[in-house]
Amino acid sequence: MKPKAYAIDWIAVGRRIRGLRGFDMTQADFASRIGVSQSYLSAVERGRNEIGAEVLLAIGREFNRSLEWLLTGVE
């Protein structure tokens, strides 16, 4: 039996990351904490870039969030 394939809504992922960053942290600060550029983070938050596993893991570790939550919004 093949596992089901799920489409990832990158716009929703970007919105969750933007919400996680909040209004008290700049994109530059957030990007620095996860090891990416501010311009890359900006594109991610707008859903224009897909995010690799390494970056998702860095966000999860740094901000104590599960990969499931980052990708689906469900804990």
Predicted regions mapped to residue ranges:
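A short, Lys/Arg-rich alpha-helix, primarily the initiator
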Residues: 1-23
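Short alpha-helical DNA-recognition segment
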Residues: 23-46
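Short amphipathic recognition helices of helix-turn-helix/homeodomain-type DNA-binding modules
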Residues: 69-75
